[in-house]
């Protein structure tokens, strides 16, 4: 069994969670020079771009259970690899959240009650959006994310541009949905911070598994019907 791809997924998801959530926890509201919503959106997108070039040839650079499941639904990824990929991704996200907590808690005034980049709905949505609105947003955003991934890694797509297209798509997704759910589209990314916040974050975590996984499957299936891959099974950005 080749464990390199699982280790690559763990490291890649660690980077996405640490860089993305870290930008929100540490840098977003920093006095005078805080990066704000746009900066956080860019951090998440850039984390995917950089990892796609770093580990795309090893694991396909999924970094996200919804991407793994969506690619499988789209005929681009072997079903037997779904579970180990997701386990590796979740472990990477938890490790990132642990390191982020270690660093962030070293600042005076640090308070987990501020959310620690967790995702939420209702009273815990940044814009106080209700459960239905948050669920729909996560499904649609993840569906479109998979649509871009499937398209940019298709055998007929221009070679070499998939990481940029995927990263920019994630930036756009965050720009739209941070006010609604604080943007998940990634169950692993949601799980890491939620475990440290506890309470409401864990109680609401179900939505940030169910909605992204559903959206991922929808995106994969729809693109598979729209434009079947002529070259067989690939593993994400690996083939491009």
UniProtKB/Swiss-Prot annotation:
Which residues are annotated as site, described as Selectivity filter?
Answer: 44, 174, 183, 189
Annotated site residues (Involved in tetramerization or stability of the tetramer) in this chain: 21
Task: For the motif NPA 2, give the residue ranges.
Answer: 186-188
Species classification: Bacteria, Pseudomonadati, Pseudomonadota, Alphaproteobacteria, Hyphomicrobiales
Q: What stretches pass through the bilayer? A: 10-30, 35-55, 90-110, 131-151, 160-180, 202-222
Q: Does the keyword Aminoacyl-tRNA synthetase apply?
A: no
The Swiss-Prot or TrEMBL record describes its family as follows: Belongs to the MIP/aquaporin (TC 1.A.8) family.
Q: What is this protein called?
A: Aquaporin Z
Q: Which organism is it from?
A: Rhodopseudomonas palustris (strain ATCC BAA-98 / CGA009)
One Pfam family this sequence matches: MIP
């Amino acid at each position: 069994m080749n464990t390199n791809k699982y280790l690559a997924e763990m490291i890649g998801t660690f980077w996405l969670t640490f860089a993305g959530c870290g930008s929100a926890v540490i840098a977003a509201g920093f006095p005078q020079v805080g990066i704000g919503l746009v900066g956080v959106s860019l951090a998440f997108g850039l984390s995917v771009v950089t990892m796609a070039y770093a580990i795309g040839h090893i694991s396909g650079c999924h970094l996200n259970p919804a991407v793994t499941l969506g690619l499988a639904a789209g005929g681009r990824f072997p079903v037997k690899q779904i579970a180990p990929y997701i386990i590796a991704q979740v472990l990477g996200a938890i490790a990132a959240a642990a390191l982020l907590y270690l660093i962030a808690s070293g600042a005076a005034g640090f308070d987990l009650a501020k959310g620690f980049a967790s995702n939420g709905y209702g009273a815990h949505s940044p814009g106080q959006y209700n459960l239905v609105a948050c669920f729909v947003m996560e499904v649609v955003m993840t569906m479109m994310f998979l649509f871009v991934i499937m398209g940019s890694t298709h055998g007929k797509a221009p070679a070499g541009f998939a990481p940029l297209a995927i990263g920019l798509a994630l930036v756009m997704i965050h720009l739209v949905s941070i006010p609604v759910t604080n943007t998940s589209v990634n169950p692993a990314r949601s799980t890491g911070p939620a475990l440290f916040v506890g309470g409401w974050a864990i109680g609401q975590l179900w939505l940030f598994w169910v909605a992204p996984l559903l959206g991922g499957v929808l995106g994969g299936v729809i693109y598979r019907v729209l434009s079947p891959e002529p070259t067989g099974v690939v593993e994400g950005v690996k083939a491009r």
